[in-house]
């Protein structure tokens, strides 16, 4: 019994040499090795993850720094561009005011609004728009297309819808209708039944022209007919016009005579005019002869034009 107990005592040599104790020692060594390996693996994985996180954080920091730098650069560029644009606009404004004489009210800085930003994004400023409108062109929308106006001035614009440049004329029938409408409106406004028209608005019976120039009025009376088929009043007006034309021609002849005598006449009168004669061929007329010839030609034209129906 004692031997069995002594053999099984923890300090006995049998226990040291027993196979059970050797197996348990090997398993403990293996477990410690596996633990160390797993710990090293976990530490490695943790270090890898930490390195990844640190690299990501570094990338994020660098990206944020680069973004901030870009924003700062963009802001600086924006300010520099706006400054250069403002300087160029002021130069263009001064040049246009000096060259074309435009007032400063066309170039007032407008209020900051959506339209201003849109127009600037399209590459056009308010100065260009005001300059184009001042030159007679107009923008439609926010595009870059410029359409010239049909009429450059407001005086050329007709109040009617017709686009013809000839003035609008009324016929005699339309004038009579408008006169009757005006008479009715005036009578209604004044509360009377009849209105006496002034002499300038009274209608004159128009004579119908015939082959011989003699006309018959609408009421059957035969109007007075004189030279050129005109009435007495119209003939007096035509006679006044003829006298005015003759006086203008006489003034021109007198001025030309003075110029020839003083030597300040044109060069073709100094050199003379080549005239073709039927017998002697071409000959050169003296300046005085050419002047007399031109005067005779003018007077003959006046006589032929205005006095051929006098007889």
Curated annotation (Swiss-Prot):
Post-translational modification: Phosphorylated. Phosphorylation at Ser-109 and Ser-111 mediates the interaction with spliceosome proteins.
Modification sites for Phosphoserine: 12, 109, 111
Protein localization: Nucleus
GO biological process, alphabetically ordered: spliceosomal complex assembly
Chief location bin: nucleus
Alphabetic keyword roster: Methylation, Nucleus, Phosphoprotein
Omega-N-methylarginine modification, residue list: 135
Domain of life: Eukaryota
Cellular component aspect of the GO annotation: nucleus
Xref: InterPro entries: RSRP1
Stretches with biased composition (Low complexity): 20-31
Compositionally biased intervals (Basic residues): 32-123
UniProt region (Disordered), positions on chain: 1-125
PANTHER family: ARGININE/SERINE-RICH PROTEIN 1, ARGININE_SERINE-RICH PROTEIN 1
Role this protein plays: Probably acts as a spliceosomal factor that contributes to spliceosome assembly and regulates the isoform switching of proteins such as PARP6.
Family: Belongs to the RSRP family.
Protein name: Arginine/serine-rich protein 1
Gene name in the database record: RSRP1
